Amino acid sequence: MEIRRAINADYIKIVRAIQNKGIKYITPAHVKEDISLGRQFVMMDNNKVIAILSLVYDAEHGYFAMKRLCVTNRKNNGKGYAQMMLKVVSGQANGKVGCTPWIDNGAMCHTLEKLGFSLEYIFSEKWCFYSKNP
């Protein structure tokens, strides 16, 4: 199992994995742009996509945003893959890192807190902003 930056050769595998799971919030255009800009990370095992996560610098707010986390197969839920992705990818940032889960996503909020992220505020009634400094 490895976590690394995605490359162009990963594009089709990633898109198929998110389409097979029925994910609508991550589009092929997101994947293509994130790969081309070096901000798409992928967890692979035996040439299969296990999880993806993007690390995008937000110049307006001055932090690295972790976006579009997806464990691509439901059978892999609860195995710690999301936590591994968050830990490895947040370590790639050279500054403040942020993540914005929904307030009712208790598993994600708990995982972020375990990794040392702090809840800074809640916005638009349902979004939490968690951050961590290097």
List where the protein language model places each region.
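Conserved catalytic-core motifs of GNAT/GCN5-like acyltransferases
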Residues: 100, 118-132
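Conserved GNAT acetyl-CoA-binding A-motif
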Residues: 92-103
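A short, internal acetyl-CoA/4′-phosphopantetheine-binding micro-motif in the GNAT/acyltransferase core
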Residues: 67-77, 101-102
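Helix-loop element at the rim of GNAT/NAT acetyltransferase active sites that forms part
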Residues: 16-29
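Conserved acetyl-CoA-binding loop-helix of GNAT-fold acetyltransferases
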Residues: 77-91, 110, 114
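Conserved beta-strand in the GNAT
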Residues: 42, 48-57, 63-70
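Conserved active-site alpha-helix within GNAT-family acetyltransferase domains
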Residues: 103-122
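A short beta-loop-alpha structural element at the N-terminal edge
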Residues: 1-14
